[in-house]
């Protein structure tokens, strides 16, 4: 009854108004699963390929009809008749049919949408929540935890049209006892921050991920205004709430130097390590993502040596959810955490492999959205199913972000004590 009988694909819109792929997998039992592929703005050069049409007369060249057609023909013919419970076999069949390292023939957006839709259909057929099915696939049934949300409340870089160089300034409610309490703390900080920015005469429009995007005199000023919001909300910095950065350094790495144009400062790699180390010493920053360019492995080693014993150093563009690259990073003791994005690698099975490799090596795994999202909430189930312990899914507004938080609230209500919220203990520092 779990045999695939039909697969359909559609061109739909993401949260930025750009086309993306939705896939629907129908099983013999009548069970249906649907999923959408997300899309990134600041992307690693070694990510799996998001197949776009390039036809400038439609969606400024960003249409995905080719990827949709690949699902409705090649992938459908490949998978109809196969068992949706055998996720690894489905993913392998699509990967083999594509035949490239970066999924450039069928498109990572096509393969991923079908991969996730098949998992959802299988969960429906089994009459279990998606997180339970993913935990079964992961070989960790019943071993759940609720993730600490890393809430991006000030946006800069590629995620906003402002002069702030660092892409994300985040808060983590590590002192909360439950996910629901953590979400409330984050929301209260968010609303206090909005009032503070408004009273300063600063812009309270939001960026791609729902965070505010004001022009500020420096990156450090973003931290200072967040600290005021935390205190105004009635919480203790460093105890109830900690801070995190996503530098997205590849976006301002030029000719071997880190150019913070918004501040008019240029750093060598070693100097930028010292800059980040200084911020981590001055403020309770417990996580820094992409603190170095994806190609600056010597710089990554330097940063890891300087602060890796007390700060979680997350590789996003560095590792692109790819086990081959992650393995090399682990061997060279580069970073101590990996950001997990489905569409960087392009299938559920490969995503689970990356999480397992990280956890087995003592690295943390942070489950993440993309800046171009949809109403799809699969990452919430993934975070709980793999006991990853951390999730990045934006700020406390925009339904493309809040939908993931709301899904996590429902999961926590279902699981109760079977999915503990561990707070500060989840971080590599």
Curated annotation (Swiss-Prot):
Compartments where found: Cytoplasm; Secreted; Cell surface
SMART domains: Enolase_C, Enolase_N
EC number: 4.2.1.11
Active-site residue list: 209 (proton donor), 341 (proton acceptor)
Keywords: Cytoplasm, Glycolysis, Lyase, Magnesium, Metal-binding, Secreted
Binding sites annotated in the UniProt record for Mg(2+): 246, 289, 316
Catalyzed reactions: (2R)-2-phosphoglycerate = phosphoenolpyruvate + H2O
GO CC field: cell surface; extracellular region; phosphopyruvate hydratase complex
Chief place where the protein resides: cytoplasm
One annotated GO biological process: glycolytic process
Alphabetical list of PROSITE patterns matching this protein: ENOLASE (PS00164)
Gene Ontology terms, MF aspect: magnesium ion binding; phosphopyruvate hydratase activity
Family matches, as InterPro entries: Enolase, Enolase-like_C_sf, Enolase-like_N, Enolase_C, Enolase_CS, Enolase_N
Cofactor, how bound (note): Binds a second Mg(2+) ion via substrate during catalysis.
Pathway(s) of this molecule: Carbohydrate degradation; glycolysis; pyruvate from D-glyceraldehyde 3-phosphate: step 4/5
Described purpose of this protein according to its UniProt entry: Catalyzes the reversible conversion of 2-phosphoglycerate (2-PG) into phosphoenolpyruvate (PEP). It is essential for the degradation of carbohydrates via glycolysis.
Family in the record: Belongs to the enolase family.
Protein name: Enolase
Species in which this protein is naturally found: Cellvibrio japonicus (strain Ueda107) (Pseudomonas fluorescens subsp. cellulosa)
Lineage: Bacteria, Pseudomonadati, Pseudomonadota, Gammaproteobacteria, Cellvibrionales
């Amino acid at each position: 009854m779990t045999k695939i009988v039909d697969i359909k694909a559609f061109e739909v819109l993401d949260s930025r108004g750009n086309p993306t792929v939705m896939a629907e997998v129908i099983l013999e039992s009548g069970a249906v699963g649907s999923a959408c592929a997300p899309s990134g703005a600041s992307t690693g050069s070694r990510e799996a390929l998001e197949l776009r049409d390039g036809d400038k007369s439609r969606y400024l060249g960003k249409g995905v009809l080719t990827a949709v057609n690949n699902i409705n023909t090649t992938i459908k013919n490949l998978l109809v008749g196969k068992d949706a419970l055998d996720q690894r076999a489905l993913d392998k069949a699509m990967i083999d049919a594509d035949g490239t390292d970066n999924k450039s023939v069928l498109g990572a957006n096509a393969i991923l949408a079908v991969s996730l839709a098949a998992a959802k259909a299988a969960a429906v057929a089994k009459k279990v929540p998606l997180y339970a099915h993913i935990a079964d696939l992961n070989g960790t049934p019943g071993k759940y935890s609720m993730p600490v949300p890393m809430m991006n409340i000030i946006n800069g870089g590629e995620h906003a049209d402002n002069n702030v160089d660092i892409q994300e300034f985040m808060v983590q409610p590590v002192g909360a006892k439950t996910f629901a309490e953590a979400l409330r703390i984050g929301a209260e900080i968010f609303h206090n921050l909005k009032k503070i920015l408004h009273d300063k005469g600063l812009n309270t429009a939001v960026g791609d991920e729902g965070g505010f995007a004001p022009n500020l005199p420096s990156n450090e000023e973003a931290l200072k205004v967040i600290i005021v919001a935390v205190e105004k909300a009635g919480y203790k910095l460093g105890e109830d709430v900690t801070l995190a950065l996503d530098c997205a350094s590849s976006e301002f790495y030029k000719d071997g130097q880190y150019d913070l144009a918004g501040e008019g400062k240029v750093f060598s790699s070693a100097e930028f390590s010292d800059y980040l180390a200084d911020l981590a010493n001055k403020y309770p920053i417990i996580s820094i993502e992409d603190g170095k360019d994806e190609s600056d492995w010597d710089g990554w080693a330097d940063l890891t040596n300087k602060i890796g014993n007390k700060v979680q150093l997350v590789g996003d563009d560095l590792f692109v959810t790819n086990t081959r690259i992650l393995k090399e990073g682990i061997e060279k003791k580069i970073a101590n955490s990996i950001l997990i994005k489905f569409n960087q690698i392009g299938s559920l099975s490969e995503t689970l492999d990356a999480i397992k490799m990280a956890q087995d090596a003592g690295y943390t795994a942070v489950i993440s959205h993309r800046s171009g999202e949809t109403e799809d909430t699969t990452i919430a189930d993934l975070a709980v199913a793999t006991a990853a312990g951390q999730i990045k899914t934006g700020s406390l507004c925009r339904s493309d972000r809040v939908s993931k938080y709301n899904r996590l609230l429902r999961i926590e209500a279902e699981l109760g004590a079977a999915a503990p919220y561990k707070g500060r203990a989840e971080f590599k520092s």
